């Protein structure tokens, strides 16, 4: 009996070690996909934004003609540029169960490219130095928040409801401010937005970790590939929102 218990504990220890090793690989994959998505977004936003700024100044463009830029930003096509990433995200969420892992990865990269188009205007409005500074601050804050969410022993699953309510409140306030055009309200939205998405970063990092442990413990490995993509998408969105809200405080306009 004692020998059986020893074998059982040894087997459990091996299983735990395997899960821990798999968890590290899973989180590395999540962060890797997120980073690649951010790189795609950044490159496209920079290329399009710099050409847009050049076209506005009457200078030669490098990649896109002034006519194409005019169509993208000054015609009804601009609504596609603005809302296409949202449509892709909602469609992805609805169809992810039917997609293969490769298809899901392709949709994520498509979303990243479309988001690059959607936010390219920042390179035409803000100085490159202030954009780089804001990105650096965002990256440090994000890493700290995500690391805390991963390592903390505190169960923060209860934050979810309040954070989602915060996101809904931000959306409503932003819609209202379209009509009010209040700088004070925009300041408040940006400040609260940083806090809400900071909380979501820690919350969802812990959720990604716990989801992996639950799936791996029950042998549901076939879903883990797509779970990594969904986790990367969530963290990508939180990073981008923190960056954009901080840019309202730290960005210097051209």
Task: Put a short name on every predicted segment.
Residues 1-254:
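A hydrophobic alpha-helical transmembrane-helix feature that marks the membrane cores
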């Amino acid at each position: 009996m004692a020998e059986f218990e020893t074998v059982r504990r040894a087997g459990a220890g091996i299983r735990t070690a395997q899960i821990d090793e798999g968890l590290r690989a899973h989180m590395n994959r999540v962060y890797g996909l997120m980073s690649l998505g951010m790189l795609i977004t950044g490159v496209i936003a920079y290329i399009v934004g710099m050409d847009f700024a050049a076209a506005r100044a009457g200078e030669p463009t490098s990649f896109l003609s002034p006519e194409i830029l005019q169509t993208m930003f000054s015609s009804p096509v601009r609504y596609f540029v603005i809302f296409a990433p949202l449509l892709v995200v909602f469609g992805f969420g609805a169809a992810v169960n039917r997609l293969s892992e490769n298809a899901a990865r392709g949709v994520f990269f498509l979303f990243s490219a479309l988001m690059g188009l959607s936010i390219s205007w920042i390179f035409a409005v803000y100085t490159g130095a202030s954009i780089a500074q804001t990105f650096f601050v965002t990256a440090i804050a994000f890493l700290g928040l995500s690391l805390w969410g991963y390592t903390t022993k505190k169960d923060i699953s209860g934050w979810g409801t309040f954070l989602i309510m915060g996101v809904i409140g931000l959306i409503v306030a932003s819609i209202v401010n379209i009509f009010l055009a209040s700088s004070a309200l925009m300041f408040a939205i940006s400040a609260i937005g940083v806090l809400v998405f900071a909380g979501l970063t820690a919350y969802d990092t812990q959720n990604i970790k716990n989801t992996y442990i639950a799936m791996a413990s029950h042998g549901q490995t076939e879903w883990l590939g797509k779970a990594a993509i969904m986790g990367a998408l969530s963290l990508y969105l939180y990073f981008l929102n923190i960056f954009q809200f901080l840019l309202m405080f730290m960005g210097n306009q051209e």
